[in-house]
Regions:
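A broadly conserved detector of short glycine/acidic/proline-rich loop/turn motifs that flank catalytic sites
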Residues: 46, 54-55, 77-79, 102, ...
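Internal, well-ordered alpha-helical segments in soluble enzyme and binding-protein domains
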Residues: 1, 11, 36, 69, ...
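Glycine-rich flavin
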Residues: 1-60
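Solvent-exposed alpha-helices and their adjacent loops that cap or buttress functional pockets
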Residues: 15, 31-35, 63-67, 88-91, ...
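Alpha-helical interface subdomain recognition
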Residues: 90-246
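A short, charged helix-loop
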Residues: 65-94
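Flexible, glycine/proline-enriched loop segments at strand-loop-helix junctions
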Residues: 27-29, 58-64, 93-100
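Short clusters of hydrophobic/aromatic residues that line enzyme substrate/ligand-binding pockets
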Residues: 58, 83, 123, 127
Length: 246
């Protein structure tokens, strides 16, 4: 986003040198890691404002995920702080990044569950040798494997910036969110009651999956994008199984 602004006031170079720029996009009610940022990109309607951290007032917000530092930001927009008026595909990029994170999170949960199922012995044999545990883990892996190519396809088409590409991002966000939800819950279940204690880290994965699922657009919001795309497609027997042309 900084690179596309005509007036980034030198913050692009500062960001490349390591300065933190927090992003307050209209789709997110709070700004993540605003307390560690040197400057913030904030929205006032469709306008983009670049504000130094000294010119805002931050209030810490509670988060379901204890490792996400979220803040509400009080600030005053002015012509001097305005640097643009087009958020472009920022929301799509944020949603795609969240989807990619959830795929990685889901896979890590499965890997932890597999390792524990191999190591935990009950009634003289590893719990992973039972069909119930095998099927539970396998179902989560299938969910991830079906979501992963959806995320890859969305990433490949993101630069096109059409309704079709936005629908692919929406599909990726929904699919990855569902996979992360299933995998994180499965991993907790595979570990038994211990899975929701501070003795293991699984509850952090579950909480992050929940938080990311609603960051950069909820499933309902992305479902509306997909619905809008479907409404543009031809209907009828000749079009039902036709390949989509973007």
């Amino acid at each position: 986003l900084l690179a596309r602004l005509d007036d980034n006031r030198g913050w692009l170079a500062k960001a490349l040198a390591g300065a933190v720029i927090a992003l307050g996009h209209p789709s997110n009610p709070f700004v993540a890691d605003a307390d560690s940022a040197s400057a913030l990109l904030l929205a006032d309607g469709d306008d983009i404002h670049l504000i130094a951290s000294d010119d805002v007032t931050l209030t810490r917000a509670e988060s379901f995920d204890p490792f996400r530092r979220l803040f509400s930001v009080e600030w005053t927009p002015s012509p001097a702080t305005k640097v643009g008026s087009n958020w472009g595909d920022t929301a799509d990029r944020g949603a795609l990044l969240a989807a990619a994170q959830m795929i990685g999170l889901a896979q890590r949960c499965i890997d932890l569950a597999v390792a524990y199922a191999k190591d935990r012995v009950q009634f003289g044999k590893p719990i992973g040798s039972t069909q119930a545990v095998k099927h539970m883990i396998s179902s989560a892996q299938v969910k991830v494997e079906f979501a992963r190519p959806v995320v890859h396809a969305a990433a490949a088409e993101l630069p096109v910036a059409t309704l079709a590409s936005r629908a692919r991002v929406a599909h990726a966000k929904i699919a990855a969110g569902a996979a992360a939800d299933v995998a994180s819950r499965m991993a907790v279940q595979a570990h038994g009651a211990m899975g929701m204690t501070w003795e293991v880290d699984l509850h952090f994965f579950l909480k992050r999956a929940f938080a990311l699922n609603y960051a950069w657009g909820s499933p309902a919001v992305h479902g509306e994008t997909i619905s809008a795309r479907i409404a543009t497609l031809p209907t009828g027997p000749d079009a039902t199984f036709a390949s989509e042309v973007t």
